[in-house]
Every structure is written in structure tokens, then in C-alpha cells.
UniProtKB/Swiss-Prot annotation:
Residues found modified as Phosphothreonine: T510
Alphabetically ordered keywords of this record: ATP-binding, Glycoprotein, Kinase, Membrane, Nucleotide-binding, Phosphoprotein, Receptor, Repeat, Serine/threonine-protein kinase, Signal, Transferase, Transmembrane, Transmembrane helix
Reactions this protein catalyses: L-seryl-[protein] + ATP = O-phospho-L-seryl-[protein] + ADP + H(+); L-threonyl-[protein] + ATP = O-phospho-L-threonyl-[protein] + ADP + H(+)
Record-listed ATP binding positions: L351, G352, Q353, G354, G355, F356, G357, S358, V359, K373
Domain of life, per lineage: Eukaryota
UniProt EC number: 2.7.11.-
Protein name: Cysteine-rich receptor-like protein kinase 37
Domain Gnk2-homologous span(s) in chain numbering: 27-132, 142-252
Phosphotyrosine sites (modified residues): Y418, Y518
Similarity comment: family membership: Belongs to the protein kinase superfamily. Ser/Thr protein kinase family. CRK subfamily.
Length: 646
């Protein structure tokens, strides 16, 4: 019975694969499920301006369009070979777009890395229903070998193999060494003199959003693919979504016009790239022994070293596991590893600073990027915030909450290790006139919805009930796709599920985002988080900082909620809306007005009239006409005489 189920399942998967993988041809693959009309419209919209966008952005461009759904949102990545001519690049992309439309009329994903008809330029185009930005993508892959055999051209295949491997290694090292001055930073073209032939040409390129280590890995996979499957051919190309490799006995893409020839390399006894023979005819027996025996010895040494390194890393990186009272575990990191990862907490690695310490970027030995929060020594409440955040984030998992990877409490250090979020925090965008232009209404709406989902999880959907107590723009991190992640749970409070509010004698947080009942009396609830959400929402709509507004209009001591409320009731809506926000085909002016309405409902002085985060998310997700309560006056706050922490 078990075997029958396995066979049936395997056959079903095969049928599904044959159904979804509709087209494969020289450097071109269509795959995935069939898309709907909205997905097709989004794809057409992105394709319409893609060639010009690639050229105007230095040869590499990525974008996404559509509602935040795998069924509607399209992500596209495109690039040209470095050193391209602008018109040749545009023409190449225009051709591949037309091919994509005709050969992939209904499928959600496509990948191609092709050349124009004259072999003058290469370009790559990929679209998917998920973001690939910054991710190593090895599949699908295509291999296009030269149909002719190389055996007839070389008498000594062993010598050719050694020289070929040396050339490939040199090209690979150069391509995977990032040149930060160029958008197309991972690239190398080499022209090498061989003993038995005048020139051999090799070219490698990676998409520029990879790490150097991932670029190198991708290119090695391409080289190994060719060696395993088509060794003995007179050249060929291997392409993957993240990288491309080609070698030939003649120049191509006009990539070698200004490349200086490298003299024939000295013979090598071994290589870091494994060499595979195509068949017995390609090598004589003695030559096989020359190549294979050293390779096997090196492989054994390599495996032993890797095993030893892995054992060492398992003890070095994580030397303990922290168990919370509820049986949850959290990784404890070694201090020496964190010091190394952050370059001894150098200024170059510093990302920012908060009330309880500084945040640094780090890179683990595995290549994983991390964010390291180092709590300030002598900060008074640092120890409490440290323990609070570890205990809470150990038990919370949500796409809109920052992920805590582990901690370190070695010696007198208290350190938290998070996933690295590349686009920093929301305040770096919303309060900067240049960066704010990136925040189209589509992006702003996505961020607002994401923060609301994160709060809903904290307030209602997790096993706990948590009040954040310090929700603000600087505590909203943005990933590579500008999706928000709520961060900084050091001040959060844990409630039992039947509790609805609490009171504290130690008021902590950021003035301007605090609900009036919390700032004045220390009373907090889910509705105090809603108030903070409302202030942040109004900041995103207006592009104005609550603090900056106070300084600009100091005489009136008018905060942002009051500023928006007055103009709302007077009908002066244009003064509320950020003039730098780019228009959107998806978000109408009515949607923007709805956002203002929701923001004002959140910052009402009467706690009972503020909506729950569940209601807010319901309103945000309904794009038809909806009925919402009429907002009542907001809290008119003046700076209190009390000091925070009373």
C-alpha cells in the first residue's frame, strides 16, 4: 500500500511538472502555474518600460507591481552584460520581452539569459510571483554546448584540461570580487593563450544584488554543470537566474575588444574545481591518473577540513541554548564571534543608535548578514529590556515582526542578534525629502497594512497578548521588498488573554507617539498601541514628523494629530497629503482619504472610541465603499511637566 502511494504521488508530481514546465529552449525557460488577468496586466505594465529603465539605471533594474499577493504581484529583474552599448542592450531586452510574451503567454515565471542575433550582446530577464532580490537562485538552469567536439583540435587533452581549469578559476575569482564602483559589479571577461591554440575566451557575470560568496557559488555550479555533462565540446554556456558562464574558442558579445591576452598558464597538478571526463576517448589512461589521483587526494583533504571546520563552528558560534520558562529555546552566541562579525563594533559597521544602545551590521562565518544590538553599559534599564525582548521574541513568529536569531550575555555584555533587514527603518525614508519619493502610495499602503498585521498578531492572534508600548517609525524596519517588520520589543508588556489594560509607574517610550492616558497616568492597553499606530499613519500620509512639526510651529505647540484634525474639519485636505508621494494606479485619492480618516480615528482622545487593530485591518483590506465612524476631536497634547520614568 505504502509503495503504491509513493508511486502514485510521484506520477502525480511528474504530471504536474510536465503541465507547468511548458517551454524550454536555448537559454529560455517558462514554468509555474497559469496566471490570472491581474497578474498579466501587472506583467505587461512592467515590461512596457523595462528596456529603458535597465539602460537608465546602469544596466541592472528590478521592480515589482501589483497588489501584495502571489496571484497578482509580479517581480521582474533584468540586466545586460557589462560594457554594453545602450541601444544594443535595449534591443536585446525588447526581443526577449517579445519572446517571453509569445512563449510564456500564461505562466507565472520565466527566466532567460540570451544573446542577440548577431552575438553582440547578452541580456537576462526574469519575472516571478515572489521576490528574488538578494537571494541566490540556482534553478532553473540551462546549458547550451557547442555541438562540435574538441578532441580533434588538441593532441594533449590533459594539458588542455589543466590550462582550461586555470583560466576558469582566474575568471571566477575576478568575477566574484565585487567592484563597488559599478552597478554590474560581478563581471569578468578573460582572453587566455593556450599551449596548443592561440586564444580561448571566457566570460562570467552575476546579478549585482548577490553577496560575493553567493556569486562565487553560483558560478562554480555553472562550471561544474558544463564539466559533468558536456566536457569535450568546443565551448558553451550555462545560465542560472543568478549568474552566467560562457567559454569559447572565438570572441563573442564584443566583450573582448579591449581585453589583454593572458599568457599560457603553467601546468597545475591540482585544482579547486573538480574535473570530469566526458568519456574514455577523451583521455588516455595515464592522463586520467595524473588528473584524478591528485583531485581525489585534494577532495579527501577538503572533506576533512570542512568537517573539522563545521565542528569548530558548532562550538564557536553557539556554545549554549537558553531555555525560557515555557520551554522555548534561543541560541546563545559566542562573544568572540560577534566581535569578529562586526569588526569589533566598528563605526563603519554601525547602523544606528537608540535609547539603550547601538546597532551594528555583522557577517557570520557562513556569510549570513545579521544586525547586532549592543545594549549600552550602565543604561539602567538595559538588563530588563534585554531579558524582556529575548523572552518575548522567542515565542513570537510573524512575517511582520523582526526575527531574533539569538543573544549573548557574556562577561558584562548584553547583545541581541537579529535578522538583517537591508532597508533600515521607516523614519530614514519618510522624513527624508529624497528617499521619501521612493515611497509611492502603493508602497506606503503595503507598509501600513503590514504594520497593522503585525499588531493584530501581537494583540489577538499569537498565544500571548502583547502591548508594544513604543511603536514609531524608527521601530519599523523595511526588508528588501519594502515589507515592514515591527522591531524593538524591549518595552513591550505581556498580558494574560483575559486582561485588557494595565498601569505602570514607569512610563517609557517616545513622546509624541504616546497615548495621552499613558503619558499622563501610566495607563496602557491595546488602544495605546492603536494611538501610536495612528500617529505613524498620519506621518506617512503627510510626510511630516510629529517632532519636527512642533519645532516649526512652536508658538502654537501644535502636534501632528491636531494639525491634521484642524485641516480635516476645514476641508483643507491638500495641506495634509504629502506632495512628494508618487501617484499610483492602484491607490486612488479616495483610498488616501480613507487612510486619513483611519488615522484620525486612532488618535481620538476618548479611548473607547479608538478602533481595534482588527477593525483597522478590515477597513484597510476593503477597497470598496465602507462605512466608518465619524472621528471625534483628537488629544491636544502639550509637553507635560512630568519626566518620563516617574
Amino acid at each position: 500500500m505504502g509503495k503504491s502511494c509513493v508511486v502514485t504521488s510521484s506520477f502525480s508530481l511528474l504530471l504536474l511538472f510536465l503541465q507547468t514546465l511548458k517551454y524550454v529552449h536555448a537559454g529560455f525557460i517558462c514554468y509555474g502555474d497559469f496566471f490570472n488577468v491581474n497578474y498579466g496586466v501587472s506583467r505587461t505594465y512592467l515590461f512596457s518600460s523595462l528596456p529603458s529603465n535597465v539602460v537608465s539605471n546602469g544596466g541592472f533594474y528590478n521592480a515589482s507591481f501589483g497588489r501584495d499577493s502571489k496571484n497578482n504581484r509580479v517581480h521582474v529583474v533584468a540586466l545586460c552584460r557589462r560594457g554594453y552599448e545602450k541601444q544594443a542592450c535595449k534591443t536585446c531586452l525588447e526581443h526577449v520581452i517579445e519572446d517571453t510574451k509569445s512563449k510564456c503567454p500564461r505562466q507565472k515565471e520565466s527566466f532567460s539569459w540570451v544573446t542577440d542575433e548577431f552575438d553582440d550582446v547578452s541580456c537576462s530577464l526574469r519575472y516571478t510571483n515572489h521576490s528574488t532580490l538578494g537571494k541566490l537562485e540556482l534553478l532553473p538552469n540551462t546549458i547550451n554546448p557547442n555541438p562540435n567536439s574538441i578532441d580533434s583540435k588538441f593532441n594533449n587533452m590533459a594539458m588542455f584540461s589543466q590550462e582550461w581549469i586555470a583560466m576558469v578559476n582566474r575568471t571566477l575569482e575576478a568575477a566574484s570580487t565585487a567592484e563597488n564602483s559599478s552597478v554590474l559589479k560581478y563581471y569578468s571577461a578573460t582572453r587566455t593563450e593556450f599551449t596548443q591554440i592561440s586564444d580561448v575566451y571566457a566570460l562570467m557575470q552575476c546579478v549585482p544584488d548577490l553577496s560575493p560568496g553567493n556569486c562565487k557559488r553560483c558560478l562554480r555550479e555553472c562550471v561544474n554543470d558544463f564539466q559533468k555533462q558536456f566536457w569535450g565540446r568546443q565551448g558553451g554556456g550555462v545560465s542560472r537566474p543568478s549568474c552566467y558562464f560562457r567559454w569559447d574558442l572565438y570572441p563573442y558579445y564584443r566583450a573582448f575588444d579591449n581585453v589583454v591576452r593572458v599568457p599560457a598558464p603553467p601546468p597545475q597538478a591540482s585544482s579547486t574545481i573538480i574535473d570530469y571526463g566526458r568519456d574514455e576517448k577523451s583521455f588516455q589512461g595515464s592522463n586520467i591518473a595524473i588528473i584524478v589521483v591528485p583531485s581525489v587526494i585534494n577532495l579527501i583533504i577538503f572533506v576533512v577540513l570542512i568537517f573539522s571546520w563545521k565542528r569548530k563552528q558548532s562550538h564557536t558560534i553557539i556554545n549554549d541554548v537558553f531555555d525560557s520558562n515555557n520551554g522555548q529555546s534561543m541560541l546563545r552566541f559566542d562573544l568572540r564571534m560577534i566581535v569578529t562579525a562586526t569588526n569589533n563594533f566598528s563605526l563603519e559597521n554601525k547602523l544606528g543608535q537608540g535609547g539603550f544602545g547601538s546597532v551594528y551590521k555583522g557577517i557570520l562565518p557562513s556569510g549570513q548578514e545579521i544586525a547586532v544590538k549592543r545594549l549600552r553599559k550602565g543604561s539602567g534599564q538595559g538588563g530588563m529590556e534585554f531579558k524582556n525582548e529575548v523572552l518575548l521574541l522567542t515565542r513570537l513568529q510573524h512575517r511582520n515582526l523582526v526575527k531574533l536569531l539569538g543573544f549573548c550575555n557574556e562577561k558584562d555584555e548584553e547583545i541581541l542578534v537579529y535578522e538583517f533587514v537591508p532597508n533600515s527603518s521607516l523614519d530614514h525614508f519618510i522624513f527624508d525629502e529624497e528617499k521619501r519619493r521612493v515611497l509611492t502610495w502603493d508602497v506606503r499602503y503595503t507598509i501600513i497594512e503590514g504594520v497593522a498585521r503585525g499588531l493584530l498578531y501581537l494583540h489577538e492572534d499569537s498565544q500571548l497578548r502583547i502591548i508594544h508600548r513604543d511603536l514609531k517609525a524608527s521601530n519599523i524596519l523595511l526588508d528588501a521588498e519594502m515589507n515592514p517588520k515591527v522591531a524593538d520589543f524591549g518595552m513591550a508588556r505581556l498580558f494574560d488573554m483575559d486582561e485588557t489594560r494595565g498601569q505602570t509607574s514607569r512610563v517609557v517610550g517616545t513622546y509624541g507617539y504616546m497615548a495621552p492616558e499613558y503619558a499622563t497616568y501610566g495607563q496602557f492597553s491595546t488602544k495605546s498601541d492603536v494611538y501610536s499606530f495612528g500617529v505613524m499613519l498620519l506621518e506617512m500620509i503627510s510626510g511630516k514628523s510629529n517632532k519636527k512639526l512642533e519645532k516649526e510651529e512652536e508658538e502654537e505647540e501644535e502636534e501632528l494629530p491636531a494639525f491634521v484634525w484642524k485641516r480635516w474639519i476645514e476641508g483643507r485636505f491638500a495641506e495634509i497629503i504629502d506632495p512628494l508621494a508618487a501617484p499610483s494606479n492602484n491607490i486612488s485619492i479616495n483610498e488616501v482619504m480613507k487612510l486619513i480618516h483611519i488615522g484620525l480615528l486612532c488618535v481620538q482622545e476618548d479611548i473607547s472610541k479608538r478602533p481595534s487593530i482588527n477593525s483597522i485591518l478590515f477597513w484597510l483590506e476593503r477597497h470598496a465603499t465602507i462605512t466608518m465612524p465619524v472621528p471625534t476631536p483628537v488629544a491636544y497634547l502639550t509637553r507635560p511637566s512630568l519626566s518620563l520614568g516617574h
